[in-house]
UniProtKB/Swiss-Prot annotation:
GO terms for cellular component: cytoplasm. Its cofactor is Zn(2+). Keywords: Cytoplasm, Endonuclease, Hydrolase, Metal-binding, Nuclease, Ribosome biogenesis, rRNA processing, Zinc. Single strand-specific metallo-endoribonuclease involved in late-stage 70S ribosome quality control and in maturation of the 3' terminus of the 16S rRNA. It comes from Chlamydia trachomatis serovar L2 (strain ATCC VR-902B / DSM 19102 / 434/Bu). This is Endoribonuclease YbeY. GO terms for biological process: rRNA processing. Its EC number is 3.1.-.-. The lineage of its organism: Bacteria, Pseudomonadati, Chlamydiota, Chlamydiia, Chlamydiales. Belongs to the endoribonuclease YbeY family.
């Protein structure tokens, strides 16, 4: 687990899967720059990269649905709400889900898709929803804007070296 210094929000990143190599510092950079782009202040964010079995088990525990999914978000403190420490939430991401979704891919395409899953979870923490077609359209637009910004700043996920 890697943690940023205390002058920044604490970004807790944990890679608990072995399907895809994840550079933990790239995950931290993605979260920090996303928060800056969205102008969100928080004390803590948690991101866990899990294998399919662990994510399906969490899906069952949280939503009584044992099916595979790509990401689960557990928002904790809403942005702008006073709490200390302010914990924006927890993101649980399956890198292997990106492999299944893409089927054939380059390394860059794979890490872009996994980055999308992290951004998707972060947007849920900010209150975005994807229950209706209009909500999905708005969320997809925000994902695309965020991913473009992150790519420009070389802040997408990358493999560990």
């Amino acid at each position: 687990m890697l943690i940023l210094d205390r002058s920044s929000p604490q970004i807790f990143i944990s890679n608990e899967q072995q399907d895809v190599s994840i550079d933990l510092q790239s995950a931290q950079r993605l979260v920090v720059l996303f928060l800056e782009l969205q102008k969100v202040s928080t004390d803590q964010v948690y991101v866990y990269f899990l294998d399919d079995t662990a994510l399906a088990q969490l899906h069952d525990e949280q939503f009584s649905d044992p099916s595979l999914t790509d990401t689960i978000t557990l928002p904790i403190d809403k942005p702008g709400i006073a709490s200390f420490p302010h914990v924006l939430g927890e993101a649980f991401v399956s890198p292997k889900a990106a492999m299944r979704f893409l089927e054939q891919y380059t390394e860059d395409q794979l890490y872009h898709e996994i980055s999308r899953y992290v951004v998707h979870s972060l947007l849920h923490m900010l209150g975005y929803d994807d229950q209706t077609d209009e909500d999905k359209r708005i969320m997809q637009e925000q994902e695309d804007v965020s991913l473009s910004f992150l790519a420009e700043h070389q802040a997408l996920l990358r493999p560990a070296v």
